[in-house]
């Protein structure tokens, strides 16, 4: 039986979110994996670090501004997903890991992504702003070749974020809310 895939709205309603719930206002998060894909249908490549460029994206990624498929798509700067969600989804699918197949750039641990929605935060020394929660898309199912991935990631497929400052993001970097963005930019 094939998986029923329906088009998803541009922005997922917050009340449908099935990702990590905030357990305390003092969570401590970090980057556990980094991925880019040079082209839309190519496999994600695991990296130990990646250059983030404000208003452009991650160097080497398919959505890096000025690449053929990122023109006029400012909401495609970077994607984040919770490692805790990936572990649950992998267990549901009966596989060891789906981090690379999730097609997300930054895999986080200890970060309730819903806390970053419409807020500024830092990954290492790179400032970002959470733009929207999102759903898996039919392209993910096609490229991942993993039956059931759409359902496993439904309502918990991650966060799109805009990159606000240049810098290098590394595996192991901390992730924190930007307490006072005005002070950081002064």
Each predicted region: which residue ranges?
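Metal-cofactor-dependent catalytic cores
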Residues: 1-186
């Amino acid at each position: 039986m094939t998986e029923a895939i329906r088009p998803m709205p541009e922005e997922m309603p917050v009340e449908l979110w099935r990702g990590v719930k905030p357990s305390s206002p003092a969570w401590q998060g970090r980057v556990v994996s980094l991925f880019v894909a040079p082209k839309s249908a190519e496999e994600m490549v695991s990296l130990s670090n990646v250059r983030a460029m404000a208003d452009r994206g991650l160097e080497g990624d398919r959505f890096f501004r000025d690449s053929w498929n990122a023109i006029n798509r400012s909401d495609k700067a970077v994607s984040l997903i919770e490692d805790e969600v990936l572990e649950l989804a992998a267990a549901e699918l009966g596989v060891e890991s789906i981090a690379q197949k999730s097609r997300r750039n930054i895999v986080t641990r200890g970060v309730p992504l819903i806390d970053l929605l419409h807020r500024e935060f830092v990954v290492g020394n790179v400032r970002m702003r959470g733009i929207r929660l999102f759903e898996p898309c039919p392209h993910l199912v096609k490229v991942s070749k993993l039956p059931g991935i759409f359902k496993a990631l439904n309502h918990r497929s991650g966060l799109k974020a805009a990159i606000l400052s240049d810098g290098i993001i590394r595996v192991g970097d901390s992730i924190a809310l930007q307490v006072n963005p005005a002070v950081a930019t002064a």
